[in-house]
């Protein structure tokens, strides 16, 4: 094999060669393939297709021609990159769902919104649309520069005159090397109005431009949610715009509904969207859809029908579809375009400024071109006028000349004519020698002089030129402008909140004695039959009952306050919904409790921003605090500090108030203080609080509650040895905060220390739990009503080494009330006060009772007589002691 000549071998470092070659390739892709020019909004392939259509005379008034002919001509002359890329680009320009203002008028199958491809180019035909002519208008008047094509045999435009702002009108998308562009389409009327405003006020702000240009206007219409993404994109060139389908909920008879989708987001494949919905229904990720069909047609337009089950919530299903399917998606704006041949990220104003400058250049160059042509014509007419004035001499000179060249030279010398004038005289027909033709030449000459003056005035005054640009843009707006298709919905629709996907319904959340939590619909309880009195049998490790309960909406908030002074927050729907028989899930699986942290209070709240409601806290060491409810509106999953206190202290209870209640604090040594809530100054969320009650040695707070000034409620006291009593709230006079309180029971070895102090109405049941796991349920109304100093009556018999550990209020069984076994709980009423609500807690089948206590009536009567005799003397002694303490 013959060796190559040495001169043809060029040794290069492979690293340098790779670097330079890749950079050359990258720049070629960026500049000559993937990015649009800021002036005409076209990539090279689109520009070449439109120029090829223009050169072939495929205007809207001509018949269609085969797409294969167009593609072949463009590929052969301007774009040697394969026919498929050219045809695909042309197809997209013909799709009214891809281009806001299609630039190609296609005949045949040019694809669909379902992702169907266009027919082969040998079957389809095309021509230019009317608006495309405005992109090419004046292209032959030296308005733009032409460059050589790929082989140097043809000339092609470097940019089109673009008499309307196509970059923003039709948008653009493309992926280059190291960068990409994605520009949304806009409404032509709004765009031209924006350009006009910019031309009148170069210092206009983007906010002012947005008064003319509301936002993108997609060819598939649909909705845009909010303006924040639009504003960010217009200001910085980058942003995310939320797009949503237009859907309505229709009634279809029989109490059933259907969701009808009539517009879908831009660039969404309708067929894939429907497949996604069907997949979610099949996988049971969306429930309640019974039928799904595509009724789209040329007559009705887009129409996707989703039938909804009778018992399903159509609004919730639609919100789920928005979140989980392309019914709602985003358009990522990245406004990169070629500016002076270089890729640049531009904002809205910069895009319009570059376009306006381009139009001024086009109009200026066209004016200069027209001026040159007008002056050339005037020059010819001046020669013809001279010839008509000396017609006999002209004819004689021509007759005497032997050749055309001699005649031309003779005319130039004798009449001081230019070569062009002399040639025009020689070319003049004899019929122009008539008087009528002479008048026409004179009139044309005078018109040309006026026209030349106008053109020179345009070039001499920038404002006159700018006004001409405005007039031409206004004309295009009036001819091609249309109404906005895409509706912009205001109101902060950036994301669907979880509650938008969940039906709002009344629920019950229960927290058990053993810290298991669950939720159930209120309707589940109401459907139950009455259960038996007594206690369901359980193993020792499984003994449990509902210790706290709240009723609320799935969209309401639940605040969990722990013994360590922290607060956690959940939405109602965030608590798992389980069956009635289920014991629930450990509360630590729902909220991230710290070690040794126990829920002390659970409160349901609808509006955490309320300025009229307060939370009152009480700790074991007698500290009390009042804080505005609004301080707890922003609680994260990890919880936050609700009250600060010493290490040896802990939170006992929290109550929600209206700010006008009386506070009741009770201690284990049977002291109780009552003082107005108004004496507590509202403190911050993490504040420590102030002294609520002065504790004697060894004493601690065991209960916190609230009461109205004229309350008919009673104070229930239960002691560790199983004794209890009821005393009217009004037997406890108001005193100053921080006092030692007054006696609420006589503590002896017989009844033991107080374990529970709370308010009751007399309509509740009481659940009493011992340290041995024995549980008893009894009617509060069966507990004797005694004076403050009474010891109370026996509520439960205890064995050796047993004591009462927990007491919980439960709504009593009463035939005349609800015929349901319901538990008392507190929630916020409209006036901000805590109100009693009910929900069933007993199972339908009571099971085997492990302990049922019958109160000995004779023993109780005897105890009562002894206590009544002592009550009066104890009151007198206590009042004297209290007075001395306060002094």
Swiss-Prot record:
Gene Ontology MF, one: DNA negative supercoiling activity
InterPro entries assigned to the protein according to its UniProt record, in alphabetical order: GyrA, GyrA/parC_rep, Gyrase/topoIV_suA_C, Topo_IIA-like_dom_sf, Topo_IIA_A/C_ab, Topo_IIA_A_a_sf, Topo_IIA_dom_A, Type_II_DNA_Topoisomerases
Outcome of swapping residue 84 to L/A: Resistant to fluoroquinolones
GO BP, one annotated term: DNA topological change
Catalytic activity reported: ATP-dependent breakage, passage and rejoining of double-stranded DNA
Compartments (UniProt record): Cytoplasm
Its EC number(s): 5.6.2.2
Region spans: Disordered: 811-865
Keyword list, A-Z: Antibiotic resistance, ATP-binding, Cytoplasm, DNA-binding, Isomerase, Nucleotide-binding, Topoisomerase
Gene Ontology cellular component annotations, sorted alphabetically: chromosome; cytoplasm; DNA topoisomerase type II (double strand cut, ATP-hydrolyzing) complex
Motif (GyrA-box): 528-534
Positions of the catalytic residues: 123 (o-(5'-phospho-dna)-tyrosine intermediate)
Feature: compositional bias, Acidic residues: 813-823
Occurrences of domain Topo IIA-type catalytic (ranges): 35-501
Assembly description: Heterotetramer, composed of two GyrA and two GyrB chains. In the heterotetramer, GyrA contains the active site tyrosine that forms a transient covalent intermediate with DNA, while GyrB binds cofactors and catalyzes ATP hydrolysis.
More details: Few gyrases are as efficient as E.coli at forming negative supercoils. Not all organisms have 2 type II topoisomerases; in organisms with a single type II topoisomerase this enzyme also has to decatenate newly replicated chromosomes.
Family: Belongs to the type II topoisomerase GyrA/ParC subunit family.
HAMAP family assigned to the protein according to its UniProt record, in alphabetical order: GyrA (MF_01897)
Role summary: A type II topoisomerase that negatively supercoils closed circular double-stranded (ds) DNA in an ATP-dependent manner to modulate DNA topology and maintain chromosomes in an underwound state. Negative supercoiling favors strand separation, and DNA replication, transcription, recombination and repair, all of which involve strand separation. Also able to catalyze the interconversion of other topological isomers of dsDNA rings, including catenanes and knotted rings. Type II topoisomerases break and join 2 DNA strands simultaneously in an ATP-dependent manner.
Protein name: DNA gyrase subunit A
Originating organism: Staphylococcus aureus (strain NCTC 8325 / PS 47)
């Amino acid at each position: 094999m013959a060796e190559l000549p040495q001169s043809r071998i060029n040794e290069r470092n492979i690293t340098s060669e790779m670097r330079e070659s890749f950079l050359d390739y990258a720049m070629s892709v960026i500049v000559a393939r993937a990015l649009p020019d800021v002036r005409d909004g076209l990539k090279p392939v689109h520009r070449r297709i439109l120029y090829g259509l223009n050169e072939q005379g495929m205007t809207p008034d001509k018949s269609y021609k085969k797409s294969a002919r167009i593609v072949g001509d463009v590929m052969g002359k301007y774009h040697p990159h394969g026919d498929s890329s050219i045809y695909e680009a042309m197809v997209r320009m013909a799709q009214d769902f891809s281009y806001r203002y299609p630039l190609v008028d296609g005949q045949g199958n040019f694809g669909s919104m379902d992702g169907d491809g266009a027919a082969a180019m040998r079957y389809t035909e095309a021509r230019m649309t009317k608006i495309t002519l405005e992109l090419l208008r004046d292209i032959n008047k030296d308005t733009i520069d032409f460059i050589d094509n790929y082989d140097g045999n043809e000339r092609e435009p470097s940019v089109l005159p673009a008499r309307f702002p196509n970059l923003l009108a039709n948008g653009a998308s493309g992926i280059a090397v190291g960068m990409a562009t994605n520009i949304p389409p806009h409404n032509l009327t709004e765009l031209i109005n924006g350009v006009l405003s910019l031309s009148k006020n170069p210092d206009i702000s983007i906010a002012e431009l947005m008064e003319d240009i509301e936002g993108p206007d997609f060819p598939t219409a649909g909705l845009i949610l909010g303006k924040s993404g639009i504003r960010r994109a217009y200001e910085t060139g980058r942003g995310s715009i939320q797009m949503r389908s237009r859907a309505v909920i229709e009634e279809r008879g029989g109490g059933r509904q259907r969701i009808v989708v009539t517009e879908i987001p831009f660039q969404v494949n309708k067929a894939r969207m429907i497949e996604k919905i069907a997949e979610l229904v099949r996988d049971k990720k969306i429930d309640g859809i019974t039928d799904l069909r595509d009724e789209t047609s040329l007559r009705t337009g887009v129409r996707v029908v989703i039938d909804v089950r009778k018992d399903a919530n159509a609004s919730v299903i639609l919100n789920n579809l928005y979140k989980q399917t392309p019914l709602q998606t985003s358009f990522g704006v990245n406004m990169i375009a070629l500016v002076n041949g270089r890729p640049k990220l531009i904002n809205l104003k910069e895009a319009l400024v570059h376009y306006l400058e381009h139009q001024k250049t086009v109009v200026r160059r066209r004016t200069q071109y027209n001026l040159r042509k007008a002056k050339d014509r005037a020059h010819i007419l001046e020669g013809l006028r001279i010839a008509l004035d000396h017609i006999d001499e002209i004819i004689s000179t021509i007759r005497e000349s032997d050749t055309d060249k001699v005649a031309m030279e003779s005319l130039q010398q004798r009449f001081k004519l230019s070569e062009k004038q002399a040639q025009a005289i020689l070319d003049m027909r004899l019929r122009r020698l008539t008087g009528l033709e002479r008048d026409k030449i004179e009139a044309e000459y005078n018109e040309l002089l006026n026209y030349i003056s106008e053109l020179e005035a345009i070039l001499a005054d920038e404002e006159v030129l700018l006004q001409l640009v405005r007039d031409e843009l206004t004309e295009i707006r009036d001819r091609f402008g249309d109404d906005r298709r895409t509706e912009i919905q205001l109101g902060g629709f950036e994301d669907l909140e979880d509650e938008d996907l969940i039906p709002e319904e009344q629920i019950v959340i229960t927290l058990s004695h053993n810290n298991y939590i669950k939720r159930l619909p209120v309707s589940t309880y109401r459907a139950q039959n009455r259960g038996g009195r007594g206690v369901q049998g359980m193993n020792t490790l499984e003994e449990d009952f509902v210790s706290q309960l709240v009723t609320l909406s799935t969209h309401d908030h639940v605040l969990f306050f722990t013994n360590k002074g922290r607060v956690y927050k959940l939405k109602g729907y965030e608590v798992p919904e389980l069956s009635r028989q289920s014991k629930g899930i450990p509360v630590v699986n729902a909220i991230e409790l710290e070690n040794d942290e126990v829920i002390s209070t659970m409160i349901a709240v609808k509006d955490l921003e309320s300025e009229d409601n307060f939370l009152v806290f009480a700790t074991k060491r007698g500290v009390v605090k009042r804080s505005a409810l609004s301080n707890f509106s922003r609680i994260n999953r990890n919880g936050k500090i609700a009250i600060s206190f010493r290490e040896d202290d802990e939170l006992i209870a929290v109550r929600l108030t209206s700010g006008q209640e009386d506070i009741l604090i009770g201690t284990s040594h049977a002291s109780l203080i009552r003082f107005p809530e108004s004496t507590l100054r509202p403190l911050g969320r993490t504040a420590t609080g102030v002294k609520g009650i002065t504790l004697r040695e060894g004493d601690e707070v065991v209960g916190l509650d609230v009461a109205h000034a004229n309350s008919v409620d009673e104070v229930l006291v239960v002691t560790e040895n199983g004794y209890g009593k009821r005393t009217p709230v009004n037997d406890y006079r108001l005193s100053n905060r921080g006092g030692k309180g007054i006696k609420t029971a006589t503590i002896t070895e017989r009844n033991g220390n107080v374990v529970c102090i709370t308010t009751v109405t007399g309509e509740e049941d009481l659940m009493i739990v011992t340290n041995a796991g024995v549980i008893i349920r009894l009617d509060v109304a069966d507990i004797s009503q005694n004076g403050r100093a009474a010891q109370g009556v026996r509520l439960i018999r205890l064995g050796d080494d047993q004591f009462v550990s927990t007491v919980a209020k439960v709504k009593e069984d009463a035939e005349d009330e609800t015929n349901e076994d319901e538990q008392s709980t507190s929630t916020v009423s409209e006036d901000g006060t805590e109100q009693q609500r009910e929900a069933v807690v007993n199972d339908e089948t009571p099971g085997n009772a492990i302990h049922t206590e019958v109160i000995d009536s004779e023993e109780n009567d005897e105890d009562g007589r002894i206590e009544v005799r002592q009550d009066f003397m104890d009151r007198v002694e206590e009042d004297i002691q209290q007075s001395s303490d306060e002094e």
